[in-house]
Swiss-Prot record:
Name of protein: Putative antiporter subunit mnhB2
GO BP term (any one): monoatomic ion transport
Family the UniProt entry places it in: Belongs to the CPA3 antiporters (TC 2.A.63) subunit B family.
Record-level Gene Ontology MF annotations: antiporter activity
Coiled-coil residue windows: none
Description of how the protein assembles with itself and partners: May form a heterooligomeric complex that consists of seven subunits: mnhA2, mnhB2, mnhC2, mnhD2, mnhE2, mnhF2 and mnhG2.
A Pfam family matched in the record: MnhB
Transmembrane feature ranges: 10-30, 35-55, 70-90, 114-134
Keywords, alphabetical: Antiport, Cell membrane, Ion transport, Membrane, Transmembrane, Transmembrane helix, Transport
Length: 141
C-alpha cells in the first residue's frame, strides 16, 4: 500500500466502527433471530482484516492487545465447558439454562447459557479466521 492512502484509511475507520457495531448486534440477536456467534465472528474478523489491509499489519497488531491464537483457544474452552457443564448436574449435553435478572438501571435482563456458548464460538471464529489470514499474508500469526 502507498503511504498516502488517506481516503482508504479514513473510510476504514468509519467502516470498522460500523462492522463492529453490526457484529455486536448480530451476536446478541442470535438466540432469538438469525445470527449468533459464528456470523458475528465473521463480521468481527472482517473488521480486523480491513484494518490490516488499510494500515500496517505490525502497527495494528501492536495496538491491539489480542493474541488471536489464544483467543481461539479460549473460545473453544468456553464453548466446550458450557456444553459439558450440564452433564455434571444430570442434564443432557448442551442443555440451556435461562433466568431473568432485575438490575437497577437496566431493568429486566433475560440471561441464557447459550449466550456464553455463542461467545465461545465468536472467539473461536475470530481467532481462526484472523490467524489463518495473517499466516497466509506472511504476517505474524
Amino acid at each position: 500500500m502507498k503511504e498516502n492512502d488517506v481516503v482508504l484509511r479514513t473510510v476504514t475507520k468509519l467502516v470498522v466502527f460500523i462492522l463492529l457495531t453490526f457484529g455486536f448486534y448480530v451476536f446478541f440477536a442470535g438466540h432469538n433471530n438469525p445470527g449468533g456467534g459464528f456470523i458475528g465472528g465473521l463480521i468481527f474478523s472482517s473488521a480486523f482484516i480491513l484494518m490490516f489491509l488499510a494500515f500496517n499489519v505490525e502497527e495494528v497488531l501492536e495496538s491491539l492487545p489480542i493474541d488471536f491464537r489464544i483467543l481461539m483457544i479460549i473460545g473453544a474452552l468456553v464453548s466446550s465447558i458450557t456444553a459439558i457443564m450440564p452433564t455434571f448436574f444430570g442434564k443432557p449435553f448442551l442443555s440451556q439454562y435461562e433466568t431473568t435478572l432485575t438490575l437497577p438501571i437496566l431493568g429486566h435482563i433475560h440471561v441464557t447459557t447459550i449466550t456464553l456458548f455463542e461467545l465461545g464460538i465468536l472467539f473461536s471464529v475470530v481467532g481462526v479466521i484472523v490467524t489463518v489470514m495473517l499466516s497466509l499474508s506472511g504476517g505474524r500469526s
